[in-house]
């Protein structure tokens, strides 16, 4: 997606009406975009700068901007459930996904998290996404390619079980698991992740949360896992009339963070809790 300059042919743009409703279209010469508030000629948008306002055939005004990554993710065609921006942002931050990083992703889904990972690692980094289901992999491929215009050079999509990965030992800096049974691939992840590397796990249920945390502890090659969830609530602000919105984005998932220990190292047991196999 372009970031600056006038809108050009073939580019995706976002129209926002007076009620805040958003529409996305790809600019094609001679085409028209139809809404319930009238049509908008693509030719009227091509060549404009971002932040311009156009008028529909019915006289309605629309703000024209390039869609942000969050806009694209929330409007792109879905197959599997997407990872919401509030969780993707924390995965990138808590997982310390840095420019140039080699990131392993298990569970490409619809490609929502993949896009955030690709943005974070930049052109010098690499994202390797494993997806067992061919239909999910195709959804991810279409959505990622739709955002970039083509499959990015620094993205590798593998339709296979991560447990069967033939990647070299210690070949990734960070790993992210978004799958039903992440505990089943911990042996593969511990082999592939560098010492000190961060593992982030995304799970939806309390049962999954308990099982993955206990599995990490049992392996005894990870730091003590941290687990949390995030609830997001918007606020309405009009002068001094400030109040929370009636609806909120509540539970979407639990996130778990841990780091790979050096071979043979044993982390100190957390105070206040005995660890089976370490403290007797």
Curated annotation (Swiss-Prot):
A molecular function (GO) term: tRNA (adenine(58)-N1)-methyltransferase activity
One GO cellular component term noted in the UniProt record for this chain: tRNA (m1A) methyltransferase complex
Top-level EC class: transferase
Keywords: Methyltransferase, S-adenosyl-L-methionine, Transferase, tRNA processing
Description of activity control: Inhibited by Mg(2+).
Disulfide bonding pattern of the chain: none
Record EC number: 2.1.1.220
GO biological process annotation, one example: tRNA methylation
Entry annotated with the keyword S-adenosyl-L-methionine: yes
Domain of life: Bacteria
Family: Belongs to the class I-like SAM-binding methyltransferase superfamily. TRM61 family.
Subunit comment: Homotetramer composed of a dimer of dimers.
Written domain comment of the UniProt record: Contains a large catalytic C-terminal domain that binds S-adenosyl-L-methionine and a smaller N-terminal domain that may play a role in tRNA recognition. Domains are connected by a linker region.
Function: Catalyzes the S-adenosyl-L-methionine-dependent formation of N(1)-methyladenine at position 58 (m1A58) in tRNA.
The protein's name: tRNA (adenine(58)-N(1))-methyltransferase TrmI
Organism: Mycobacterium tuberculosis (strain ATCC 25618 / H37Rv)
């Amino acid at each position: 997606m372009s970031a600056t300059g006038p809108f050009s042919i073939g580019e995706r743009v976002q129209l926002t009406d007076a009620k805040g409703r958003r529409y996305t279209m790809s600019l094609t010469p001679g085409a028209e975009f139809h809404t319930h508030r009238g049509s908008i000629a693509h030719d009227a948008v091509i060549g404009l700068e971002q932040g311009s306002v156009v008028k529909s055939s019915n006289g309605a005004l629309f703000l024209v901007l390039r869609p942000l990554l969050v806009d694209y993710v929330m409007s792109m065609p879905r197959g599997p459930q997407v990872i919401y921006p509030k969780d993707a942002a924390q995965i990138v931050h808590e997982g310390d996904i840095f420019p140039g990083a080699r990131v392993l992703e298990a569970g490409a889904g619809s490609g929502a998290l993949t896009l955030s990972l690709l943005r974070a690692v930049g052109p010098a980094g690499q994202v390797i996404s494993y997806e067992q289901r061919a239909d999910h992999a195709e959804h991810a491929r279409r959505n990622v390619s739709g955002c970039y215009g083509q499959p990015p050079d620094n993205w590798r999509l593998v339709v296979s079980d991560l447990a069967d990965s033939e990647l070299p030992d210690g070949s990734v800096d960070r790993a992210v698991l978004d799958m039903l049974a992440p505990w089943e691939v911990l042996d593969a992840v511990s082999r592939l992740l560098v010492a000190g590397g961060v593992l982030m796990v995304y799970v939806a249920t309390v049962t999954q949360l308990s099982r993955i945390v206990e599995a990490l502890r049992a392996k005894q090659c990870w730091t003590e896992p941290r687990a949390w969830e995030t609830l997001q609530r918007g606020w309405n602000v009009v002068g001094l009339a400030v109040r929370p919105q009636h609806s909120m984005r509540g539970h979407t998932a639990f996130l778990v963070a841990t780091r790979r220990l050096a071979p043979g190292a044993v982390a100190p047991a957390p105070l206040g809790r005995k660890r089976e196999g370490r403290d007797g």
